């Protein structure tokens, strides 16, 4: 008989989950490889899996065993496939934008009939008050990045409001801008997945609250830790390696099913915190310890920040955002002080997965929070996305106005065309004025701004708005400004540039400085420049500075079909597999 391993919180054996997930991925046409494994301490495993054909599609898993980590990674992969999360930051092209459906067969399009007023039928009153308290949202802000199809309108998804089971249409733009990956889950059963999604919402909400408010937490008593010898073995190994560990009850007095573990690194005076949530205390504690080391070996524990006494810095939104991304943000010394702000609570919200779901929903009701859920079954794996306004937001609602991910929509066509080097000076001047007028951050990566997968080894992979400004000034023959932005580019990208662009920008800077010097004859220096920097770099930079040559260094041109961008086409190929499954399996 084949081995069957059951773990707390899961409704199927690990072996069955792994086999089912792997078979379904193969049937869908995804070519998954286990790219890296880590087992830095006993009972802590993590794995990184990815699609060999499309590296944008990847996931990570963690667990107390190798099988648990692989099942976790495969579950996360299905969660991201089912919710389209892998594709949330990318333009899907005109063909998909005009197809029967862009995201899901049950999406609803709301035509834009007034540039200033949101169409009727979008959101409910509660959500309108939450997302648009000052009536500042315009329809343009709710056009989704993936379709960029203003003429078609605003695309919204049907979410079920759990308080009364009513369907509410939430624009895809709001979901992608404010909630990113929070509250997404896939599982063996509906309630297993929902419990996971709700737990994640609590984990992130409580984590932010504790960090932002510098709350002091109670340690989990030794008598409670003694119940979990395998978790203690993991912690003991970390402490043996020189990393003191604190395990805290983060339930805020028994209210939320959350644990916090903090690792100190005396070697460089830094620390970092890990949070985990689940209705079962043991599962929450195990998740928190495995999360601490997900994707990290013991050598990777020296990249965090020292604790801080400046609680204003700790509470900054940018710091909380860093914690969401990789937990490397600041935490307050106050979190670690002797006297806690709450008593320890030996909480327990566990039961069957359906009972656990009901227990978690009761917490949201007590907090008077509306919960909205969209279910997905089109890949024959249950998945869901859960939105709890005021709790599961990763970014503030005003990001829709000031930092919308569709801001680059109107720029895509012209920026992709610039390297064709056939525009007039007036166009380059207008682009510079618009970049300043729209107050676009100079550090913005252009590929993210316009939603593309950059061709490997091309300048698009690292191009930022500041570097684009250098190129535009060069196109206008404005050498002093081009020089300023070339220096900015070299400084900004020093950690990401390979040797070739570093050499090109050194060459460009020297050649601009030479041509700005009225007392020197540039021709006298070309030969030595070629010896220093190489003939190819000198030829290209010299042409851009003084011979009317193309200043758009290492940028292949394209159009909005992006046919010559192989990596972007690979992403669209992966999305095509999903679109096929949606057409065939939508229930």
Curated annotation (Swiss-Prot):
Which InterPro entries has this protein been placed in?
A: YcaO-like_dom, YcaO_C
Q: Which Pfam families match?
A: YcaO, YcaO_C
Q: Which Gene3D superfamilies match?
A: 3.30.1330.230
Cite the YcaO domain residue spans from the record: 61-426
Q: Which PROSITE patterns match?
A: YCAO
Kindly give the NCBIfam families that the UniProt entry links to this protein: YcaO-type kinase domain (TIGR00702), YcaO_for_S12 (NF040716)
Please identify the protein, giving its name as recorded: Uncharacterized protein HI_1265
This protein's species is Haemophilus influenzae (strain ATCC 51907 / DSM 11121 / KW20 / Rd)
């Amino acid at each position: 008989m084949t081995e069957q391993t059951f773990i707390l919180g899961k409704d199927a054996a690990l072996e069955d989950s792994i086999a089912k997930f792997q078979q379904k991925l193969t049937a869908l046409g995804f070519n998954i490889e286990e790219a890296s494994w880590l087992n830095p301490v006993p009972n802590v495993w993590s794995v990184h899996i990815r699609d060999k054909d499309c590296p944008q599609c990847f996931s990570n898993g963690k667990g107390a065993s190798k099988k648990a980590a692989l099942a976790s990674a495969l579950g996360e992969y299905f969660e991201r496939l089912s919710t389209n999360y892998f594709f949330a930051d990318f333009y899907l092209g005109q063909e998909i934008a005009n197809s029967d459906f862009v995201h899901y067969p049950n999406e609803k399009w709301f035509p834009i009939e007034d540039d200033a007023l949101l169409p009727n039928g979008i959101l409910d009153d509660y959500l309108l008050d939450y997302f648009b308290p000052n009536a500042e949202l315009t329809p343009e802000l709710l056009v989704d990045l993936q379709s960029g199809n203003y003429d078609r309108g605003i695309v919204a998804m049907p979410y079920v409001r759990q308080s009364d089971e009513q369907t509410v249409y939430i624009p895809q733009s709001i979901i992608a801008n404010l909630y990113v990956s929070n509250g997404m889950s896939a599982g063996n059963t509906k309630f297993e997945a929902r419990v996971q999604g709700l737990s994640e919402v609590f984990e992130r909400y409580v984590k932010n609250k504790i960090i932002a408010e510098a709350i002091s937490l109670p340690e989990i008593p030794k008598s409670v830790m003694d119940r979990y010898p395998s978790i203690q073995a993991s912690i003991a190994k970390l402490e043996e390696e020189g990393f003191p560990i604190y395990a805290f009850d983060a339930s805020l007095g028994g209210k939320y099913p959350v644990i916090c573990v903090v690792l100190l690194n005396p070697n460089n005076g830094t620390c970092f915190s890990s949070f985990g949530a689940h209705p079962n205390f043991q599962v929450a504690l195990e998740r928190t310890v495995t999360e601490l080391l997900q994707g990290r070996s013991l050598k990777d524990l020296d990249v965090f920040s020292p604790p801080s006494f400046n609680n204003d810095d700790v509470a900054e939104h940018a710091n909380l955002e860093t914690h969401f991304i990789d937990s490397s943000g600041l935490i307050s010394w106050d979190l670690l002080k002797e006297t806690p702000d709450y008593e320890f609570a030996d909480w327990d919200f566990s039961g069957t997965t359906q009972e656990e779901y009901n227990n978690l929903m009761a917490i949201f009701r007590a907090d008077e929070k509306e919960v909205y859920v969209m279910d997905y079954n089109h890949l024959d794996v249950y998945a869901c996305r859960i939105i709890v306004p005021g709790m599961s937001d990763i970014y503030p609602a005003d990001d829709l106005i000031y930092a919308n991910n569709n801001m680059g929509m109107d720029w895509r066509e012209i920026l992709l065309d610039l390297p064709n080097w056939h525009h007039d000076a007036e166009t380059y001047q207008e682009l510079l004025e618009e970049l300043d007028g729209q107050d676009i951050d100079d550090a913005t990566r252009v590929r993210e701004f316009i939603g593309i997968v950059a061709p490997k080894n091309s300048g698009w992979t690292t191009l930022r708005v500041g570097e684009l400004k250098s190129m535009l000034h060069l196109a206008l023959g404005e050498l002093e400004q081009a020089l300023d932005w070339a220096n900015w580019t070299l400084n900004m990208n020093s950690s990401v540039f390979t040797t070739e662009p570093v050499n090109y920008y050194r060459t460009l800077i020297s050649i601009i400085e030479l041509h700005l010097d009225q007392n020197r004859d540039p021709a006298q220096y070309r030969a030595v420049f070629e010896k220093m920097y190489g003939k190819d770099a000198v030829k290209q930079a010299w042409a851009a500075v003084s011979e009317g040559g193309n200043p758009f260094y290492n940028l292949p041109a394209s159009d909005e079909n992006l046919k010559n961008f192989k990596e972007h086409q690979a992403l669209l190929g992966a999305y095509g597999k999903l679109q096929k499954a949606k057409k065939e399996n939508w229930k």
